[in-house]
């Protein structure tokens, strides 16, 4: 790490999230107790979700509501999660490796339908570690779902073998959504791709609700 005082580099201790949580668990200080209780709660909830998967959906719904998302958006997002799961299951059946290969295929799909790589898309929305899908508009989510479910359906039909064949299928799935995007943009005259992120999108929704409420009052 570079010191702001003399500009020299010095070794710095760093820890992953897992290591950091283990450190917190080992701290004897009473000040660490709230964190330990929180970790215990999260662990209990994770075990409950393993026993009853429906709890995962219910808690995801609650989390999105607390963040200010509309129910319409949440319904689309939860459906998108299911579509994504079906796609990754298909990739697994086709021998695609989790991690890097999943990321590359996802990038191919995103680039094919949106015209941007995942990194470029996140940069457009001012995102860093945040989930791109959590910062999409409803229309963006729907088109991304169309791209992913198209890739899954083509894969099930053609049963591609090897990474490169799956890569071609991913592009074709993305192209299906690209055609839909271009058709919609031709009808509306507006770009489907927006630079707005979750905070900005929620603000727009809030302002619209307030405007409707004032109109009803008048």
What spans do the regions from the language model cover?
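Positively charged, phosphate-engaging catalytic surfaces used for nucleic-acid and nucleotide handling
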Residues: 5, 15, 19, 25-218
């Amino acid at each position: 790490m570079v010191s702001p005082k003399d500009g020299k580099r010095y070794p710095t201790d760093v820890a992953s999230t897992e290591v950091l949580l283990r450190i917190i668990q080992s701290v004897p200080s009473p000040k660490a107790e709230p964190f330990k209780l929180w970790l215990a709660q999260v662990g209990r909830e994770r075990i409950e979700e393993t026993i009853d998967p429906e709890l995962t959906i219910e808690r995801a719904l609650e989390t999105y509501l607390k963040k200010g998302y509309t129910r319409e958006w949440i319904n689309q997002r939860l459906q998108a999660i299911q579509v994504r799961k079906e796609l990754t299951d298909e990739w697994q059946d086709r021998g695609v490796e989790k991690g890097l290969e999943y990321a590359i295929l996802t990038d191919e799909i995103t680039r094919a339908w949106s015209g941007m790589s995942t990194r470029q898309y996140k940069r457009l929305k001012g995102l860093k570690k945040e989930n791109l899908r959590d910062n999409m508009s409803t229309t963006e989510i729907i088109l991304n779902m169309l791209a992913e479910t198209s890739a899954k359906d083509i894969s099930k039909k053609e049963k591609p073998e090897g990474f490169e064949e799956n890569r071609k299928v991913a592009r074709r799935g993305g192209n299906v959504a690209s055609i839909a995007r271009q058709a919609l943009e031709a009808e509306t005259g507006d770009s489907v791709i927006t630079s707005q992120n979750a905070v900005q999108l929620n603000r727009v929704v809030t302002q619209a609700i307030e405007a409707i409420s004032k109109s009803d009052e008048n």
